[in-house]
Amino acid sequence: MSHAVIPTGRRIAPGQVLAGGGVCLLALAVLSLMVGPVWIAPSQVLGALWHPDPLNVSHILVTSTRLSRTLIAIVVGAGLAVAGALMQVLTRNPLASPGLFGINAGAMFFLIVCVSLFPKVAMSVWLWSAFAGAAVAGCLVWLIGTMGKGSLNPLRMVLAGAAITAMFAAFSQAMLVVNQEGLDTVLFWLAGSVADRELATVLPLMGYCLAALVGALLLSGQVNVLNAGEAIARGLGQRTGRIRLLMSLLVVALAGGAVAMAGSIGFVGLIVPHMARKLLPADHRWLLPGCALLGACLLLLADILARVVIVPQEVPVGVMTALFGAPFFIFLLRRGGRYG
């Protein structure tokens, strides 16, 4: 009597993985609306979303603070994760992250300049100044990385990113020595947080990030070809220089918008692509949506834990992602960067 052999080690279908990620994201989003110094029942959360009562304290808490930080965490986590996946293809380095473009340092310097020169302006001006700094740093790294033969050299770009980061960090330290008043604001921003952001203030930046996410998904086919190798991509008639330029612009838009909204949040762009590769095939048409879902889930989870670790105070979400990411990064280094 013959027995059917059930194959082991079979991957779950990519569609099922993405569906599961969507369910997890929805569950974490609802939990994020519930959790805090004051816990809110699920029925109250649903009531606040569908029929908000301006006299109900729980409804006010959900709509005024928790909804905005939940949406920001979703967009920022997805943006950083997709930017990290693109960056690893762009540099052909499995340990690359969006920080290689000097985005964090550029955003920090421009923010310090804005706080020092215009301390009384609205927070939206600070956010846009940080986004501008991220864009300037990314453009400088790109220009230096394409010097010489006119094509992007991954090694030159990494070195340029380190140099630009060091330069902006030195400028930032000099500005803080001259002007101590902006130190508290900058330290809060450096720690990384999705709290105390009004939805109306960050909505334009969220729109840019969402548009860049759509652009990354549309470019996923070309990313696959480039990931196969420069020679193969050229042999297939692909304009690799244009693909790299578009990928770089998307990285700057995604990571720059995320940094401007939430500050410096590390490790999401590094560890999420590796997690996604363990669950999904090496096809960026599946991998990039998976990174977006996993990144959003990871940052939401980190933000939820940040609220309950030392109630009634909160731990900056950037600290929580560092606690998750640092051991994972050490693990990747021990594996020689060949994880996944």
Curated annotation (Swiss-Prot):
Keywords on record: Cell inner membrane, Cell membrane, Ion transport, Iron, Iron transport, Membrane, Transmembrane, Transmembrane helix, Transport
UniProt key word Iron: yes
Database matches in Pfam families: FecCD (PF01032)
Subcellular location: Cell inner membrane
CDD domains the record matches: TM_ABC_iron-siderophores_like
Annotated membrane topology: Multi-pass membrane protein
Gene3D superfamilies: ABC transporter involved in vitamin B12 uptake, BtuC
GO-annotated biological processes: achromobactin transport; chrysobactin biosynthetic process; siderophore-dependent iron import into cell
GO cellular component: plasma membrane
Transmembrane segments: 21-41, 70-90, 98-118, 125-145, 158-178, 199-219, 251-271, 286-306, 313-333
GO molecular function annotation: transmembrane transporter activity
Cell membrane listed as a keyword: yes
Chief location category: membrane
Family note: Belongs to the binding-protein-dependent transport system permease family. FecCD subfamily.
Functional description taken from the UniProt entry: Part of the binding-protein-dependent transport system CbrABCD for uptake of the siderophore achromobactin. Probably responsible for the translocation of the substrate across the membrane.
Protein name per the record: Achromobactin transport system permease protein CbrB
